[in-house]
Amino acid sequence: MRKWVTRALAALFCACVLFLCGMTFVPNLREFGYAVFRRYANYLPSNATVFDNISARISAFEDSLGNVFYKKEAFQQLNASLQYAIGKQMLYFGDSTMVKLRGGQLYELRQDEVLSETVYDLVELNAYCESQGIPMVFVYAHTSLYGDSQALLPVGALDYNNETADKALAILREGGVDVLDSREFLRDYPLEDIIYYTDFHWTVPAAREAAEQVGAWLNANGVPADESVLAEDMYEKRVEENIFFGRLGQRIGTKNIAPEDFALLIPEFSSYIKVTHREGEEEEVREGAFEEAVMRVDEAMRRNDEGYSANCYYAYGPHAWESEYENASAPDSRVLVLKDSYGTPVAAFLSNAVGGLLATDQRKTTLSAEDYVAQYQPDAVVVVYCQDMLREKNYAFMDE
């Protein structure tokens, strides 16, 4: 009897595995193909060997699998609920550990200080820009831990966020790169004003402050920018209550943390901007006032059937391969912004202050940063990245 029970359970297990594989792979064959045959190049180190090539394809496949696994969020939420039920303060999700900070914000621990060669690529890019007479600044978007780490983290949590940031920025500064550190320019803001409870991004007000800092840096380096349109008092703050449920919140579900308020900043000055978003061969052109051309409030703030939106952070535009802004009423300066998702709203705000701005996501594009500098011929280069971009070699940055 026991033998038949064992066989039945084994058969049921195999059937479940086959079902999950089928529901994961069949709808996403194109995604896996793109990862293995195209996106893998973003994982290749310098002077890649055959084995590096194979490893890069495996990494691209694994990342895609993790993103599209069938009912991934449901499994994660069940896992989180079970861990909370037995009193755990640190939630384990295989390759990451999540905690709640003392203020209630969700945060993924950074458990090592390993940097990628991207940090040194930035130093090389800065040297190239200097050789072309183009000033460059690196804007560091810190993740969550502003202030005393030990005062924010639960007892027993081990984290190397600040140590890794210090290590990376020291290399950049020693290499001659100008650095704007958000831990410095956001120091006086309350934590709840600059980080979300359910998401890892910085808030819209934090992004505006970063843009204002860049505007001041541009003028200090001889690149005209209208700093007045970046000031806090030039924007109306609109708060939508209990609407935003970010990526971290989705991992543990609304039973474990509630959707949060989301603040938008709307210009109180007149503007007319043309923006062209490019995603591969696709192109979208919008023009008009900032709120109409750049912002996408209706789409981003639309609540789903569960009563929240997971897309609020897209209110200032998509994380496109390229977003080119043209503003005839601003000073005639051209700025190249190399960014991750933290930099999307920064570039959007900055488009009010300069005549031309090209924002690129180097994780997606096939052109290197040097290519963009050569083609766009900017007056200044601004790099806006969070720490994760300095930890992982996941985009093309410099020509070899």
Regions found by a protein language model. Name each.
Residues 1-400:
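Extracellular glycan-modifying ectodomains
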